[in-house]
Amino acid sequence: MAERPGSPGSREMRLLTFRDIAIEFSLEEWQCLDCAQQNLYRDVMLENYRNLVSLGIADSKPDLITCLEQNKEAWNIKRNEMVAKHPVTCSHFTQDLHPEQGIKHSLQKVIPRTYGKCGHENLQFKKCCKSVGECEVHKGGYNEVKQCLSNTQNKIFQTHKCVIVFGKFSNCNRHETRYTGKKHFKCKKYGKSFCMPSHLNQHQIIHTKEKSYKCEECGKSFKRSSNCTTHKRIHTGEKPYRCEECGKAFRWPSNLTRHKRIHTGEKPYTCEECGQAFRRSSTLTNHKRIHTGERPYKCEECGKAFSVSSTLNDHKRIHTGEKPYTCEECGRAFNCSSTLKTHKRIHTGEKPYKCEECDKAFKRHSSLAKHKIIHTGEKPYKSK
């Protein structure tokens, strides 16, 4: 549906299609993306298509979506010509923003996106710089520009050397919604309103607990394809994040970051009560319960409470009789991993607990504590 041409303020108004918001790459462009950027691209395109489906706009499934769902390379799909020939302006901004002439096949130059018309003129933004904050030409108006673009789609173009902010919008009302902050998209179930249909879609996923991405191996479902991809490493054994110091590999980058602190000695989490420092925030949280006396983990069988969930899990095995930790040396089984670890010292002869007074070493910390009484003369057990 379009207004009559020639009248003041005439503008093209039509339904948004997936082709309007699709971003497509050549082989050269696709190879410029690292693995994380390619995964992000897939997530964004699939999310955009789901948004159109939820609004009843999408017709037949595009080849690009079929390709992405099958994890095929996106550049196999023929690209559309999406380059404006003339400088364009937006009525919300005073300066002209010119698209680059002679676009090269590289993400570090310009990858345009096309939408339709907004107001009197098309709307395009393009500026290359090291980061969004360093965008000199658009520094004053960037916050407004940012409102006019999908946050998830912007992420794709934040490459190492170049930030591309590029777009047109097919609907002036859609553009003004982002600009003014008006919320036209309402959740029928809870009444909450959103500026963008994608935000409404994300909200609906939360309260419907929809999980679209399923692991074929174990059946576990996830809200994001990236989370499903990461989860699959449990089954495949893939550990792509390797420590340069010792060669140990990890499934997740966060685990590698924590591991590196072993080499650096960094302990960024400090207890305000006693000053003891820890490598992990979770360890600090558990430690604080020593001072507060909090024991939030309670055994339903006997009522005994614990400060750490793992200790409760170990305790429960007393009731069930389960002993999942077996010594490979002698076959003896234990109900918790720490007990097995201590037991193994019988076979290895390891004695990690050393007395500072006489250098005598022990397999158990409790044995060292008892030994120290010899030096202190302390008599903890009084006869009645």
From Swiss-Prot:
Can you cite an annotated GO cellular component? Answer: nucleus
Superkingdom per UniProt: Eukaryota
Tell me where it mainly resides. Answer: nucleus
**Subcellular localization:** Nucleus
Annotated PROSITE patterns: KRAB, ZINC_FINGER_C2H2_1, ZINC_FINGER_C2H2_2
Q: Where are the disulfide bridges?
A: none
Task: Kindly list the GO molecular function terms attached to this UniProt entry.
Answer: DNA-binding transcription factor activity, RNA polymerase II-specific; RNA polymerase II cis-regulatory region sequence-specific DNA binding; zinc ion binding
Q: Which CDD domains match?
A: KRAB_A-box (cd07765)
Pfam assignment, any one: zf-H2C2_2
Kindly list the ranges of residues that form C2H2-type zinc fingers according to the record.
Answer: 185-207, 213-235, 241-263, 269-291, 297-319, 325-347, 353-375
Q: Which residues form the KRAB domain?
A: 16-87
Family annotation (SMART domains): KRAB (SM00349), ZnF_C2H2 (SM00355)
Gene3D superfamilies found in the cross-reference section:
6.10.140.140, Classic Zinc Finger (3.30.160.60)
Any idea which UniProt keywords this protein has?
A: DNA-binding, Metal-binding, Nucleus, Repeat, Transcription, Transcription regulation, Zinc, Zinc-finger
Q: Please give the biological process terms from Gene Ontology that the record holds.
A: regulation of DNA-templated transcription
- State what this protein does: May be involved in transcriptional regulation.
Provide the family line: Belongs to the krueppel C2H2-type zinc-finger protein family.
Q: This chain belongs to which protein, by name? A: Zinc finger protein 722
Gene (UniProt): ZNF722
